[in-house]
Amino acid sequence: ESETMAVYGSTYALGPTRVQFQNKDPRGWKEFETQLRDHSSLGSANTMRGVQRRRPSLYDLQDELKKIIVPTLILNGDEDDPCLDVSLFLKRTIISSALALLPRTGHTCNLEEPHLFNQLCETFIHQVESGRWELRDKRSMTTSIISASDPDGM
């Protein structure tokens, strides 16, 4: 809160999960940075303090997440390292979910790869609306590559 968004926005925009956007689309990234810098400093501080800091870890919500059966699409950039493990956790926990990793992409996948992002979302929506989005087959929920009943893969 001590820094204004005019200062912090530039730092945030150059974070390790956003440089991919800058490398792919310098002009689009510059607009992104400008918009971040225009955010309310108080509003941004309140979001970090009131939401990011207070909410429990998603790992602590595993029991509640296991109850989710609504269609869920998890999108993640493969270079968004802080979110990769969480995305895999969500995929393994929510039986109605699918995970798509966007290659060479950071945290801003909708901005970095808008066509691929929109295509994945459109396909997801069509599958849900047509009744073709089903729960994951429980036989596939193992780390074994040989048999669903063979937990050691032997």
Where are these regions (language model features)?
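Conserved Class I S-adenosyl-L-methionine
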Residues: 42-44, 68, 106, 141
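Active-site phosphate/pyrophosphate- and oxyanion-stabilizing loops and adjacent acidic/basic residues
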Residues: 62, 88-89, 115
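Short beta-strand/loop motif that positions the catalytic acidic residue
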Residues: 68, 74-76
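Conserved alpha/beta-hydrolase "acid-adjacent" motif
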Residues: 81-86
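Catalytic active-site module of serine/aspartate enzymes centered on a nucleophile-bearing elbow/loop
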Residues: 97-154
